[in-house]
Design a protein with these regions (language model features):
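Contiguous, non-catalytic segments that form substrate-binding/exosite surfaces or channel walls
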Residues: 39, 43, 152, 302
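Divalent metal-coordination and catalytic microenvironments
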Residues: 34, 73, 86, 116, ...
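Non-cysteine beta-strand/loop elements that form the S-adenosyl-L-methionine
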Residues: 85-87, 200, 359-365
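Histidine/acidic-residue-rich, glycine-tolerant segments that coordinate divalent metal ions
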Residues: 71-72, 93-95, 99-111, 117-118, ...
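Predominant activation on well-ordered alpha-helical scaffold segments within soluble catalytic domains
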Residues: 28, 49-52, 124-131, 158, ...
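Acidic/His- and Gly-rich active-site-bordering loop/insert found
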Residues: 5-112, 117, 121-141
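Metal-dependent amide/peptide-bond hydrolase catalytic core
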Residues: 2-9, 225-399
Protein backbone atom coordinates (compact mmCIF):
# COMPACT_ATOMS: atom_id res chain seq x y z
CA UNK A 1 0.00 0.00 0.00
CA UNK A 2 1.77 3.14 -1.17
CA UNK A 3 -1.22 5.41 -1.67
CA UNK A 4 -1.59 8.48 -3.88
CA UNK A 5 -0.79 11.14 -1.28
CA UNK A 6 2.07 12.37 -3.48
CA UNK A 7 4.24 10.58 -5.99
CA UNK A 8 7.05 8.90 -4.07
CA UNK A 9 9.89 9.20 -6.52
CA UNK A 10 12.64 11.30 -4.97
CA UNK A 11 15.92 9.59 -4.15
CA UNK A 12 16.98 9.90 -0.51
CA UNK A 13 20.30 8.15 -1.00
CA UNK A 14 22.73 9.19 1.69
CA UNK A 15 20.26 11.20 3.79
CA UNK A 16 20.61 9.07 6.92
CA UNK A 17 24.40 8.92 6.55
CA UNK A 18 24.58 12.71 6.19
CA UNK A 19 22.48 13.19 9.32
CA UNK A 20 24.65 10.73 11.26
CA UNK A 21 27.85 12.45 10.15
CA UNK A 22 26.75 16.05 10.58
CA UNK A 23 24.23 15.95 13.42
CA UNK A 24 24.49 12.51 15.04
CA UNK A 25 26.47 13.62 18.08
CA UNK A 26 24.14 16.58 18.65
CA UNK A 27 21.05 14.35 18.46
CA UNK A 28 22.45 11.80 20.91
CA UNK A 29 23.69 14.49 23.31
CA UNK A 30 20.27 16.13 23.34
CA UNK A 31 18.54 12.82 23.95
CA UNK A 32 20.79 12.11 26.94
CA UNK A 33 20.38 15.60 28.34
CA UNK A 34 16.59 15.31 28.16
CA UNK A 35 16.72 11.79 29.61
CA UNK A 36 18.61 12.99 32.69
CA UNK A 37 15.96 15.58 33.54
CA UNK A 38 12.55 14.07 32.75
CA UNK A 39 9.56 16.36 33.17
CA UNK A 40 5.88 15.48 33.49
CA UNK A 41 2.73 16.70 31.79
CA UNK A 42 2.65 20.33 30.76
CA UNK A 43 5.59 21.16 33.05
CA UNK A 44 8.26 20.67 30.40
CA UNK A 45 9.95 24.05 30.75
CA UNK A 46 13.53 22.72 31.05
CA UNK A 47 12.98 20.30 28.16
CA UNK A 48 11.68 23.14 26.01
CA UNK A 49 14.76 25.19 26.90
CA UNK A 50 17.00 22.34 25.77
CA UNK A 51 15.10 22.10 22.48
CA UNK A 52 15.39 25.85 21.89
CA UNK A 53 19.12 25.70 22.55
CA UNK A 54 19.45 22.81 20.09
CA UNK A 55 17.53 24.78 17.43
CA UNK A 56 19.48 27.99 17.96
CA UNK A 57 20.96 29.39 14.77
CA UNK A 58 18.62 27.60 12.39
CA UNK A 59 16.47 29.65 9.96
CA UNK A 60 13.26 28.97 11.85
CA UNK A 61 10.31 31.10 12.94
CA UNK A 62 9.86 29.93 16.52
CA UNK A 63 6.74 30.25 18.65
CA UNK A 64 7.01 29.32 22.32
CA UNK A 65 4.43 28.96 25.08
CA UNK A 66 2.08 26.91 22.93
CA UNK A 67 0.05 24.63 25.21
CA UNK A 68 2.07 26.16 28.08
CA UNK A 69 5.53 24.81 27.24
CA UNK A 70 5.16 23.59 23.67
CA UNK A 71 7.20 24.89 20.75
CA UNK A 72 6.27 25.34 17.10
CA UNK A 73 9.24 26.03 14.82
CA UNK A 74 8.49 26.79 11.16
CA UNK A 75 10.94 26.39 8.29
CA UNK A 76 9.95 28.20 5.10
CA UNK A 77 11.16 26.85 1.79
CA UNK A 78 12.26 28.85 -1.22
CA UNK A 79 8.98 28.36 -3.06
CA UNK A 80 5.32 28.65 -2.14
CA UNK A 81 3.28 25.59 -1.25
CA UNK A 82 1.51 23.71 1.52
CA UNK A 83 2.65 23.27 5.12
CA UNK A 84 3.62 19.85 6.46
CA UNK A 85 3.80 19.33 10.23
CA UNK A 86 6.05 16.90 12.08
CA UNK A 87 5.26 16.31 15.75
CA UNK A 88 7.20 14.97 18.74
CA UNK A 89 6.10 14.64 22.36
CA UNK A 90 8.39 15.83 25.19
CA UNK A 91 6.99 14.61 28.52
CA UNK A 92 8.08 11.68 30.69
CA UNK A 93 6.39 9.27 33.11
CA UNK A 94 6.21 8.91 36.92
CA UNK A 95 8.36 5.75 36.92
CA UNK A 96 11.57 4.99 38.85
CA UNK A 97 14.24 4.18 36.28
CA UNK A 98 16.08 0.84 36.49
CA UNK A 99 18.16 0.89 33.30
CA UNK A 100 21.56 1.52 34.88
CA UNK A 101 22.44 3.86 32.01
CA UNK A 102 25.22 6.39 32.73
CA UNK A 103 22.74 9.13 31.81
CA UNK A 104 19.86 7.72 33.86
CA UNK A 105 17.20 10.00 35.27
CA UNK A 106 18.50 12.28 38.00
CA UNK A 107 14.99 12.94 39.30
CA UNK A 108 13.51 10.45 41.73
CA UNK A 109 10.38 8.75 40.46
CA UNK A 110 10.54 10.11 36.93
CA UNK A 111 11.76 8.50 33.73
CA UNK A 112 11.54 8.76 29.98
CA UNK A 113 9.97 5.32 29.74
CA UNK A 114 8.04 5.89 26.51
CA UNK A 115 10.80 7.13 24.23
CA UNK A 116 9.74 10.77 24.14
CA UNK A 117 13.36 11.84 24.70
CA UNK A 118 14.12 10.00 21.46
CA UNK A 119 11.14 11.49 19.63
CA UNK A 120 12.18 15.01 20.58
CA UNK A 121 15.82 14.59 19.60
CA UNK A 122 14.87 12.92 16.28
CA UNK A 123 12.67 15.89 15.40
CA UNK A 124 15.49 18.29 16.24
CA UNK A 125 17.72 16.24 13.93
CA UNK A 126 15.16 16.55 11.14
CA UNK A 127 15.01 20.31 11.67
CA UNK A 128 18.79 20.56 11.32
CA UNK A 129 18.80 18.43 8.18
CA UNK A 130 16.02 20.34 6.43
CA UNK A 131 17.55 23.68 7.41
CA UNK A 132 20.62 22.98 5.30
CA UNK A 133 20.60 25.36 2.36
CA UNK A 134 20.37 22.75 -0.39
CA UNK A 135 17.40 20.96 1.18
CA UNK A 136 15.67 24.15 2.32
CA UNK A 137 15.88 25.63 -1.16
CA UNK A 138 14.25 22.50 -2.61
CA UNK A 139 11.12 22.97 -0.48
CA UNK A 140 8.00 24.50 -2.00
CA UNK A 141 6.09 25.28 1.16
CA UNK A 142 6.85 25.12 4.85
CA UNK A 143 7.59 22.57 7.56
CA UNK A 144 6.24 22.95 11.10
CA UNK A 145 8.24 21.18 13.80
CA UNK A 146 5.79 20.67 16.66
CA UNK A 147 7.24 19.91 20.10
CA UNK A 148 4.33 18.97 22.35
CA UNK A 149 4.03 18.58 26.13
CA UNK A 150 1.61 16.37 28.04
CA UNK A 151 1.01 13.37 25.81
CA UNK A 152 0.97 11.02 28.80
CA UNK A 153 -2.59 11.57 29.93
CA UNK A 154 -2.62 15.35 29.79
CA UNK A 155 -4.10 15.70 26.33
CA UNK A 156 -1.47 18.17 25.20
CA UNK A 157 -2.26 17.33 21.59
CA UNK A 158 -5.82 18.61 21.99
CA UNK A 159 -4.56 21.85 23.50
CA UNK A 160 -2.12 22.31 20.61
CA UNK A 161 -4.94 21.79 18.12
CA UNK A 162 -7.29 24.10 20.04
CA UNK A 163 -4.58 26.79 19.97
CA UNK A 164 -4.47 26.63 16.17
CA UNK A 165 -1.25 24.75 15.52
CA UNK A 166 -2.66 22.85 12.53
CA UNK A 167 -4.96 25.50 11.08
CA UNK A 168 -2.67 26.06 8.08
CA UNK A 169 -1.33 22.50 7.89
CA UNK A 170 -2.09 20.22 4.95
CA UNK A 171 -0.65 17.01 6.44
CA UNK A 172 1.01 15.83 9.65
CA UNK A 173 3.24 12.92 10.67
CA UNK A 174 4.70 11.55 13.90
CA UNK A 175 7.04 8.70 14.82
CA UNK A 176 6.95 6.49 17.91
CA UNK A 177 9.87 4.29 18.91
CA UNK A 178 8.43 0.79 19.23
CA UNK A 179 9.83 -2.16 21.23
CA UNK A 180 8.87 -5.56 19.83
CA UNK A 181 9.36 -4.39 16.25
CA UNK A 182 12.69 -5.31 14.58
CA UNK A 183 15.34 -2.62 14.84
CA UNK A 184 14.90 0.03 12.16
CA UNK A 185 11.64 -1.40 10.82
CA UNK A 186 9.09 1.23 9.81
CA UNK A 187 5.49 0.15 10.34
CA UNK A 188 2.09 1.74 9.98
CA UNK A 189 -1.36 1.10 8.52
CA UNK A 190 -4.33 2.91 7.09
CA UNK A 191 -7.29 3.48 9.38
CA UNK A 192 -7.23 2.87 13.13
CA UNK A 193 -3.71 2.27 14.46
CA UNK A 194 -4.24 3.08 18.16
CA UNK A 195 -7.33 2.71 20.34
CA UNK A 196 -9.53 5.19 22.14
CA UNK A 197 -8.60 5.26 25.83
CA UNK A 198 -11.27 6.00 28.42
CA UNK A 199 -11.13 5.77 32.20
CA UNK A 200 -13.51 5.02 35.02
CA UNK A 201 -13.61 5.24 38.78
CA UNK A 202 -16.24 3.48 40.81
CA UNK A 203 -17.30 3.68 44.42
CA UNK A 204 -18.84 0.51 45.82
CA UNK A 205 -21.04 1.13 48.85
CA UNK A 206 -22.20 -1.41 51.36
CA UNK A 207 -22.51 -1.21 55.13
CA UNK A 208 -19.63 -1.70 57.51
CA UNK A 209 -19.29 -3.97 60.49
CA UNK A 210 -17.13 -6.25 62.59
CA UNK A 211 -15.04 -8.77 60.68
CA UNK A 212 -16.41 -11.52 62.91
CA UNK A 213 -20.04 -10.64 62.12
CA UNK A 214 -20.34 -10.34 58.31
CA UNK A 215 -24.03 -11.22 58.43
CA UNK A 216 -24.70 -7.82 59.99
CA UNK A 217 -22.90 -5.95 57.20
CA UNK A 218 -22.95 -5.61 53.42
CA UNK A 219 -19.28 -6.26 52.68
CA UNK A 220 -18.00 -3.69 50.16
CA UNK A 221 -14.83 -5.74 49.59
CA UNK A 222 -16.77 -8.82 48.54
CA UNK A 223 -19.13 -6.72 46.43
CA UNK A 224 -16.16 -5.09 44.70
CA UNK A 225 -14.59 -8.47 44.01
CA UNK A 226 -17.80 -9.70 42.39
CA UNK A 227 -18.09 -6.48 40.36
CA UNK A 228 -14.55 -6.92 39.02
CA UNK A 229 -15.37 -10.47 37.94
CA UNK A 230 -18.72 -9.50 36.41
CA UNK A 231 -17.18 -6.65 34.41
CA UNK A 232 -15.08 -9.17 32.49
CA UNK A 233 -18.29 -10.38 30.83
CA UNK A 234 -18.94 -6.96 29.26
CA UNK A 235 -16.26 -7.64 26.65
CA UNK A 236 -16.35 -11.44 26.54
CA UNK A 237 -20.14 -11.79 26.30
CA UNK A 238 -21.46 -8.48 24.93
CA UNK A 239 -18.91 -7.45 22.30
CA UNK A 240 -18.61 -9.13 18.90
CA UNK A 241 -15.59 -11.49 19.17
CA UNK A 242 -14.03 -9.93 16.05
CA UNK A 243 -14.34 -6.38 17.48
CA UNK A 244 -11.29 -5.36 19.53
CA UNK A 245 -12.13 -4.10 23.03
CA UNK A 246 -10.41 -4.08 26.41
CA UNK A 247 -11.82 -3.50 29.88
CA UNK A 248 -9.21 -3.61 32.63
CA UNK A 249 -9.66 -2.91 36.33
CA UNK A 250 -6.25 -1.66 37.39
CA UNK A 251 -6.99 -0.22 40.83
CA UNK A 252 -8.83 -1.54 43.85
CA UNK A 253 -8.80 -0.28 47.40
CA UNK A 254 -10.76 -0.59 50.64
CA UNK A 255 -10.49 -0.88 54.36
CA UNK A 256 -8.53 0.44 57.31
CA UNK A 257 -7.95 -2.65 59.47
CA UNK A 258 -7.88 -6.44 59.14
CA UNK A 259 -10.92 -7.01 61.36
CA UNK A 260 -13.22 -4.27 60.09
CA UNK A 261 -15.60 -4.76 57.17
CA UNK A 262 -15.45 -1.45 55.27
CA UNK A 263 -18.58 0.24 54.02
CA UNK A 264 -16.87 1.51 50.85
CA UNK A 265 -14.47 0.20 48.22
CA UNK A 266 -12.95 1.91 45.22
CA UNK A 267 -12.23 0.58 41.73
CA UNK A 268 -10.45 2.22 38.83
CA UNK A 269 -9.88 1.04 35.30
CA UNK A 270 -9.56 1.71 31.60
CA UNK A 271 -11.66 0.86 28.55
CA UNK A 272 -10.12 0.65 25.07
CA UNK A 273 -12.13 0.51 21.86
CA UNK A 274 -11.70 1.09 18.13
CA UNK A 275 -15.38 1.48 17.26
CA UNK A 276 -17.16 4.75 18.10
CA UNK A 277 -20.57 3.11 18.59
CA UNK A 278 -19.11 0.55 20.97
CA UNK A 279 -17.22 3.29 22.79
CA UNK A 280 -20.46 5.17 23.44
CA UNK A 281 -22.18 2.01 24.70
CA UNK A 282 -19.53 1.04 27.23
CA UNK A 283 -20.33 3.46 30.09
CA UNK A 284 -23.94 2.31 30.25
CA UNK A 285 -22.99 -1.35 30.30
CA UNK A 286 -20.25 -0.88 32.91
CA UNK A 287 -22.67 0.97 35.17
CA UNK A 288 -25.54 -1.48 34.66
CA UNK A 289 -23.42 -4.54 35.42
CA UNK A 290 -21.75 -2.95 38.45
CA UNK A 291 -24.96 -1.64 39.98
CA UNK A 292 -26.82 -4.85 39.26
CA UNK A 293 -24.22 -6.93 41.08
CA UNK A 294 -23.94 -4.47 43.95
CA UNK A 295 -27.69 -4.18 44.48
CA UNK A 296 -28.01 -7.94 44.45
CA UNK A 297 -25.60 -8.01 47.39
CA UNK A 298 -27.36 -5.23 49.36
CA UNK A 299 -25.06 -2.48 48.16
CA UNK A 300 -24.76 0.01 45.33
CA UNK A 301 -22.19 1.38 42.88
CA UNK A 302 -21.55 4.89 41.60
CA UNK A 303 -19.66 5.28 38.33
CA UNK A 304 -17.53 8.22 37.17
CA UNK A 305 -16.64 7.59 33.51
CA UNK A 306 -14.30 9.83 31.51
CA UNK A 307 -13.90 9.82 27.74
CA UNK A 308 -10.25 10.52 27.02
CA UNK A 309 -8.16 10.11 23.86
CA UNK A 310 -10.08 9.21 20.69
CA UNK A 311 -9.06 6.51 18.23
CA UNK A 312 -5.90 7.36 16.27
CA UNK A 313 -7.01 7.02 12.65
CA UNK A 314 -4.42 7.28 9.88
CA UNK A 315 -5.44 8.75 6.56
CA UNK A 316 -5.24 5.98 3.95
CA UNK A 317 -3.21 7.96 1.43
CA UNK A 318 -0.91 9.43 4.08
CA UNK A 319 -0.17 5.99 5.53
CA UNK A 320 0.63 4.64 2.09
CA UNK A 321 2.79 7.65 1.37
CA UNK A 322 4.73 7.15 4.61
CA UNK A 323 5.43 3.51 3.77
CA UNK A 324 6.53 4.51 0.29
CA UNK A 325 8.95 7.14 1.59
CA UNK A 326 10.36 4.66 4.12
CA UNK A 327 10.83 2.06 1.39
CA UNK A 328 12.69 4.51 -0.83
CA UNK A 329 14.81 5.62 2.12
CA UNK A 330 15.65 2.29 3.76
CA UNK A 331 14.58 -0.45 1.33
CA UNK A 332 11.55 -2.73 1.12
CA UNK A 333 12.93 -5.07 3.81
CA UNK A 334 12.63 -2.23 6.35
CA UNK A 335 8.93 -1.54 5.79
CA UNK A 336 5.91 -3.33 7.26
CA UNK A 337 2.24 -2.65 6.68
CA UNK A 338 0.59 -3.51 9.98
CA UNK A 339 -2.29 -5.97 10.02
CA UNK A 340 -3.70 -4.93 13.39
CA UNK A 341 -3.78 -1.79 15.52
CA UNK A 342 -2.49 -1.51 19.06
CA UNK A 343 -4.94 -1.09 21.93
CA UNK A 344 -2.66 1.51 23.46
CA UNK A 345 -3.61 5.14 22.85
CA UNK A 346 -2.11 8.39 21.58
CA UNK A 347 -3.17 12.01 21.70
CA UNK A 348 -1.80 12.41 18.17
CA UNK A 349 -5.37 11.31 17.45
CA UNK A 350 -6.52 14.91 17.99
CA UNK A 351 -4.32 16.19 15.16
CA UNK A 352 -5.60 13.47 12.83
CA UNK A 353 -9.20 14.49 13.51
CA UNK A 354 -8.38 17.85 11.87
CA UNK A 355 -5.64 17.08 9.33
CA UNK A 356 -4.81 14.04 7.16
CA UNK A 357 -1.65 12.32 8.28
CA UNK A 358 -0.12 9.19 9.73
CA UNK A 359 1.25 7.88 13.00
CA UNK A 360 4.25 5.64 12.35
CA UNK A 361 6.10 3.08 14.47
CA UNK A 362 9.89 2.83 14.29
CA UNK A 363 11.24 -0.45 15.66
CA UNK A 364 13.93 -0.46 18.35
CA UNK A 365 14.26 -4.24 18.60
CA UNK A 366 12.30 -7.32 19.54
CA UNK A 367 14.17 -7.91 22.81
CA UNK A 368 13.88 -4.36 24.16
CA UNK A 369 11.84 -3.88 27.35
CA UNK A 370 8.36 -2.58 26.74
CA UNK A 371 7.05 0.96 26.81
CA UNK A 372 6.16 2.28 30.28
CA UNK A 373 8.59 -0.12 31.99
CA UNK A 374 11.51 0.99 34.23
CA UNK A 375 13.98 -1.00 32.09
CA UNK A 376 13.25 0.64 28.73
CA UNK A 377 16.53 1.41 26.93
CA UNK A 378 17.18 1.52 23.20
CA UNK A 379 20.16 1.66 20.85
CA UNK A 380 20.76 5.31 20.02
CA UNK A 381 21.72 4.39 16.46
CA UNK A 382 17.98 4.54 15.80
CA UNK A 383 17.93 8.32 16.30
CA UNK A 384 19.51 9.45 12.99
CA UNK A 385 17.30 6.93 11.22
CA UNK A 386 14.22 8.53 12.72
CA UNK A 387 15.49 12.00 11.86
CA UNK A 388 16.04 10.91 8.27
CA UNK A 389 12.53 9.51 7.98
CA UNK A 390 10.92 12.64 9.40
CA UNK A 391 12.97 14.84 7.09
CA UNK A 392 12.14 12.68 4.07
CA UNK A 393 8.41 12.77 4.81
CA UNK A 394 8.48 16.56 4.60
CA UNK A 395 11.03 16.75 1.81
CA UNK A 396 9.14 14.50 -0.59
CA UNK A 397 5.81 16.15 0.16
CA UNK A 398 7.15 19.63 -0.58
CA UNK A 399 9.57 18.93 -3.43
Amino acid sequence: MRGDFVDVSQSFEGLQAEIEENFGEKIVALRRDIHREPELGFDTERTAEKVLTALDGLPLDIETGVAENGIVATLKGKGDGPTVALRADMDALPIQEETGLPFSSEIEGRMHACGHDGHTSMLVGAAHALSQEDLRDSLSGAVKFVFQPAEEGGGGGKVMVDEGVVEDVSSIFALHLWPGLPFGKVATKAGPIMAAADAFEMEIRGSGGHGAMPHLAADAVVIAAQVVTALQTVVSREVDPVEPAVLTVGEIGAGTAFNIIPEKARLGGTVRTLNSNLRERMPGRVEAVARGVAKGMRGDANLDYTFSYPVTVNDESAAGYALGVAEDLFGAHSVQELSNPSMTAEDFSYYLEDVPGAFIWLGVGEDVSGLHTPQLAFDEEILPRGSALLAALALQSLS
